[in-house]
């Protein structure tokens, strides 16, 4: 993507995709210099939006990156809503918009967006993201059995998906199943040894205190310090 930007400094979608790479690094615990990488992701996301006011791809990836990295959930949601007006058949806008609404505390509307994305693109190569999003929404809604099931589906498609392992662990724990909860916590420790209850607020831009507390409670019950 950086090479594409070098060749075309106004290539909005390339800025958005490059920004989104920083989101992916953050959610998987891969960042080496978190403040610098977050700042660079924000910079790229803002360029995506500035260059791509009529580009659904740029608005989707850039908007989601701003919601996640800059924690501007309202702004990110508005940008993705514009992307959906431009291209209502763009599945990533549906599921990434769903993620931002989850973080904003709008689990019901998030579920509607994510479910639509699944129907719109049932063989999507990013299906694991949709499944993880549904798992997260179900978890914050208190539907722990459904959350665990969807998290395990996501892990079936991408076994190294950190958020899938986290939600599986917390869901099983709060549903009273300690053995699978411990199994998934062990996977969390392998995927990101630095993740702990105290770092959850930095890891995901969860807006509502009760949602953050629920996730911390589940992971504590699963055995994560």
Model regions and ranges:
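Short, well-ordered coil↔helix boundary/capping segments
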Residues: 159, 175-182, 206-209
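Acidic, proline/glycine-rich low-complexity intrinsically disordered segments
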Residues: 1-175
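Acidic, Ser/Thr-rich low-complexity linear motifs
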Residues: 29-33, 127-128, 193-208
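Terminal, low-structured helical/coil segments at or just beyond the last alpha-helical repeat
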Residues: 197-225
């Amino acid at each position: 993507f950086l090479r594409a930007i070098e060749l075309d400094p106004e290539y909005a979608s390339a800025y958005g995709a490059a920004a989104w790479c920083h989101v992916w690094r953050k959610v998987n615990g891969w960042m080496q210099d978190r403040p610098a990488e977050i700042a660079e992701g924000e910079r790229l996301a803002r360029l995506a939006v500035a260059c791509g006011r009529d580009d659904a791809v740029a608005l989707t990836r850039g908007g989601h990156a701003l919601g996640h990295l800059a924690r501007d959930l309202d702004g990110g949601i508005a940008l993705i809503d514009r992307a959906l007006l431009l291209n209502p058949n763009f599945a990533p806008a549906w599921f990434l918009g769903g993620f931002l609404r989850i973080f904003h505390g709008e689990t019901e509307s998030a579920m509607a967006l994510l479910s639509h994305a699944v129907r719109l693109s049932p063989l999507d190569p990013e299906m694991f993201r949709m499944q993880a999003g549904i798992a997260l929404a179900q978890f914050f809604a208190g539907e722990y059995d459904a959350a665990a099931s969807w998290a395990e589906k996501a892990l079936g498609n991408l076994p190294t998906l950190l958020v899938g392992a986290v939600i599986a662990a917390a869901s099983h724990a709060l549903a009273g199943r300690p053995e699978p909860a411990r199994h998934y916590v062990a996977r969390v420790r392998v995927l990101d040894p630095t993740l702990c209850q105290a770092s959850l607020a930095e890891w995901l831009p969860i807006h509502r205190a009760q949602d953050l507390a629920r996730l911390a409670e589940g992971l504590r019950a699963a055995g994560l310090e």
